[in-house]
Amino acid sequence: MSFFSKFFTRDKKETLDQGLEKTRSSVFEKITRAVAGKSTVDDEVLDEIEEALITSDVGLDTTVKIIEALEERVARDKVMGQQELMDMLFEIITGLMQHEGGLWEDFELPKTEGPYVLMVVGVNGVGKTTTIGKLAHQFKQKGYNTVLGAADTFRAAAIDQLVVWGERTGVPVVKQQMGSDPASVAFDTLQHAVSKGADLAIIDTAGRLHNKTNLMQELSKVRRVMDKVIPGAPHEVLLVLDGSTGQNALLQAKAFAEATQITSLAVTKLDGTAKGGVVIGISDQLNIPVKFIGVGEGIEDLQLFNPQAFASSLFNK
């Protein structure tokens, strides 16, 4: 398909297909069994489709929206064969994941005055620092002069892990000692980025949701300080979520969205889980674009998200 040649190499499509294998088994194969041999879509078929969507962590609200859209189409067309039904599901699901201006066709930065600033948030254990390391690699491969800021200062391990990623990717890391003021680290990082003529600064921040008020105040301070160094920074606030936690990822996303303005999402650890349907629910419920998905452990396996490619992989197209 010309579509895939535009967004993916064959290797990337294979990686995506492999990464979504368990979710595809959970969604596509169950739906296929539900509609096999049926010339009409009755309540039993709709119930089985609903169950398949819910068990793959699409979420109740989004599942209801999908089923209602199907019911409306079935009522209008009266008779719908298996392929027509699958095509309609594909269209509905793809539509729920599309957001205006949310799609990047490549790892290419928007043009800004000075360095482009990407602030990354997320709780411990979701793959936040790993995502930053993989992003640094991808952007460096594109020729962007990148710097990382270790502003998750509440865990020594977070600083150390980012330093390791910096060494692995050949990207400098600005850091202070554990317990330092995160805003101070962000300030130093952006000053370094400006002085070195960097194209991109990625700031790792803490994500301690147990006290939302403190988190809100901390992130607000970081943002204010960055804006003083580079007006308009951060240009992007990326929330990293663990896709293998299913609906818990959606709850986390809602909590973070209440604490600070989130402009995009990265959903990690989709390989090895049958809960990849949560990407559909998150895209629909939050109205925040998913920009990146993690579909493997390799450094290249953080992919740009594309709704049509994701749905095509789920539906084995």
Predicted regions and their residues:
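Primarily NTPase-proximal linker/entry elements flanking Walker-type ATP/GTP-binding cores
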Residues: 17-151, 158-178, 186-203
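Short glycine-rich anion-binding loops that position phosphate/pyrophosphate groups of nucleotides
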Residues: 206-208
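Conserved catalytic-core segment of NTP-binding enzymes
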Residues: 161, 178-196, 210-316
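Short beta-alpha junctions and helix-cap segments that line functional grooves
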Residues: 3, 105-106, 135, 251-253, ...
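Disorder-to-helix initiation segments
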Residues: 1-17
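Short beta-strand segments
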Residues: 121-122, 204, 240, 294
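Residue-level signal for short, function-critical loop segments
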Residues: 152-153, 243
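Short hydrophobic/aromatic residue motifs in ordered secondary structure
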Residues: 60-62, 155, 271, 299
